[in-house]
């Protein structure tokens, strides 16, 4: 009896083990959380990932679009594995003891150089940047890297005092969606617009530009501006290096899909983004570009804006760009 019970128990165990092996679920993918700027163009960059065109057997990218203040607030909390962040955030975070590691460049000036313009109304009396002395400029984020690049161009090319205190112009921060209205109603004399607004303003014929500062920076320093990068934290990299390599691969391939299929991607984001289908292609070519990689020129651009920030009194010192870029970053 005891022998038969033992045999039955052994058989039951073997049967259970075999059943378990036969029905074991596929191992769950590692999750990489990614916080990025809320913008229709960024949805285009991530289109191939979200549509399952670019896949991975190893990781799942969980993305969340955030406004600039939320991105800034998320940096010290380490809420996200990867965060789209300002180039200026790297030395500023280091000053507070927080080290950030660059995985790739996220916003690089488009070859057309149409970003970072100083806009005025078509019938405005202002003809040159010198005419804006004593006038008010509306801006979407005074402390952003994009604005720091603009100020550097105005300082170097137009010899303007760009200090926020007692400078040549009065700078006013206004929520981005309200900038064109502020310009139209005369609340401000000039404005720096976000890319989607600049695209609409240029197409309307109701506004003109006194300075394309991205072009000015290229002329002065020989680099395309880099305003944002994708960053993570050293301890996260150390814990899961292969997962972050896979993240970089997927992001880069998603960018390449968007580059090769701009009409498809543009039409898709136009449905939800309330923007023209042609905007995405124009954004990549003329306004900004999301490399998903790092070039030597990007490193030079980072060091250029940090040196400019030191000159303008924003920073006391600046790091070497090569020291903050991950050794496994995708390189151009």
Regions found by a protein language model. Give the residues of each.
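Short, solvent-exposed loop/beta-turn-alpha elements that line the ligand-binding surface or hinge
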Residues: 56, 110-111, 215-223, 289-299
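Secondary-structure end/capping motifs
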Residues: 237-314
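Pocket-lining segment of extracytoplasmic ligand-binding domains
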Residues: 88, 165, 177-268
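Bacterial N-terminal signal peptides
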Residues: 10-20
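Conserved C-terminal helix/tail region of periplasmic/extracytoplasmic solute-binding proteins
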Residues: 303-332
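N-terminal export leaders
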Residues: 4-10
